[in-house]
Structures are given as C-alpha cells and as structure tokens.
Amino acid sequence: MAKKYINDVRFWLLAIIIFGGGFALHPSVGLSILDFPSLRVGLYQIVAVSLLLFSLPLLLKKRQELLKNRWLIGGFLAIFIAITVGIFFAEARLRTALYSLSLLFLLAVGLSAGLIYSELSKSKKRKLINVGLWSGLVFGILAIIQLTVATFEPTGLGTLCAGCKADVFGFPRINLFAAEPQFFANSLLPAFFLALFQSKSRLAKFSLFFTTIAISLTFSRGGFLSIFIAITALFIIAFVKRIDASFIRKKLPIIFAGLLFGFALLFSSDRKSVV
C-alpha cells in the first residue's frame, strides 16, 4: 500500500514537472538575502525538491548501476570541475556559486526524473507523454493570448519587470510565468521534441504547431539554435546509422508553418504598436 502511494506521488510530481516548466518564476516569493534579487522560491521549485526527495530510494537502489555509467560520472565530473574553476576565477563568487548550485540541482532533478520514468509502466509512460504534449498546446495558446493582450493593452501579467512593455522593446516580450523569454522558450523544448517524435498522434501535431508558435513569439535565439542543432544532429545520426528519419521530415512543414505564423503575429503586433 505504501509503495503504491509513493509510486503515485512520484508519477504526479513528474507530471507537474513536465507540464509546468513555464511556471518557473510565478507563483513565487523573493528571498531578500545575500543581496541577490533573483533568489526566489516558488511552487515549481518546491515540486522539484519533492521529486528529488521521493527519488532518493531509487538513487540508492541503483547507485551501483549509476556509478558504473562512465558517461554519467564523466559528465558530472566535468561539470563539477568547470564550476569549481569558474567560482575560483569569478569576481562575484557568491553569485556564481548560487548559479552553479542551481545548475547542479537542475541536473539532479533531471537524473531523478529519468529514474522515476524508467520505473513506470507503459500506460503511465504514455500518460506522461500526453501530459508533455498538452503542455506544449496549452502554453502555445497562452502565449498567443499574452501577445494579443499586450498588443492592445499594456499589462503586468508575465512581463519581465515594471515598465518592460511593448513600447520599450518595440514588440511584446512573451515569457508568461517564466523569468524571461529565453527561459520560457527553453521550458517548451521538451514538449517540442516529444511532439516531434510522436509520429501518429493528432495531439502531437497540434502540440508541435503551437509549441513552435510560442517559441517563435519569444524571439529567443537560444531556442531557435537548440531546435536547429538538435534536428541537424538527428539527421546526421540517422544518415550515419542508416535510420529512417522520414517521420521528422514529415513534421518539418508543421514547424515551418508554426514559425511563419508566430513571426507574422509578432510583425502584426509591432505594426499595431506603431499605429
């Protein structure tokens, strides 16, 4: 009974993590300590900590298997060395240390999520995939709504800071509940690639279209670069290993349509603000 309860809690925590990446900033409260205004604790961070704590038994159970994974250990070791060197040479060591701890925490949550996912049944894995697809669809629609509202009426919802309006940047900056557009675009990448690999799902096609629109509305170079590099790498791997990548080529028109539609919305918003 207790094991089933723990497994259910793990599943729902992972579902929230997958769906709620766009809520990385709000709702949250700022911690006015260490002269670090960006230090905040929010609902999403609490869920992430809970996921990490509930995964500890799995980490202990599979510790031998994890320690034998050279790529995993080598990757963590390289990151740890880079962080140590970075802190040593940084001018603001405390701030660099806090950012570094955030990165390590993110990696630990990713490892925990992977372990929990590997323990799920096929039906629950399918449910999580659908959660990710719905995340892309919902946040894509919300991004369009934010753009529309910010175009016709300046609003504080989801803006970067007080006074960060469309008339300052020239067009609305779409970030919804994330700290900035770049972070919002990054939070949509899991939904984007989930939709890309679901070849026979109508939900996946809608999710891919609206996720692409949302990423284009952020005007995030990092988001565009991540998608371009990942798709290029997939085609190279498929060519070298002679893997059928036709399902990716079939999704490219959806991606291009989403980008064009998103840029058209941004252009229309810019013209509206000028008028």
What are these regions (language model features)?
Residues 81-87, 126-159, 166-170, 175-241:
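Alpha-helical transmembrane segments of multi-pass inner-membrane proteins
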Residues 141, 147-150, 235-275:
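A membrane-periplasm/extracellular boundary helix in multi-pass inner-membrane enzymes
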Residues 1-60, 85-89:
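N-terminal signal-anchor transmembrane segment
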Residues 24-38, 162-177:
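Juxtamembrane membrane-water interface segments that cap and precede transmembrane helices
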Residues 38-57, 100-110, 183-192, 225-232:
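Membrane-embedded alpha-helical segments of multi-pass membrane proteins
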Residues 72-79, 93-115, 131, 136:
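Aromatic-anchored transmembrane helix interface
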Residues 59-70, 117-128, 198-203, 240-249:
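Membrane-interface helix-boundary motifs at transmembrane edges
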Residues 6-17, 64-78, 125-132, 203-204:
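Membrane-interfacial loop-to-transmembrane alpha-helix junctions, especially the N-terminal start
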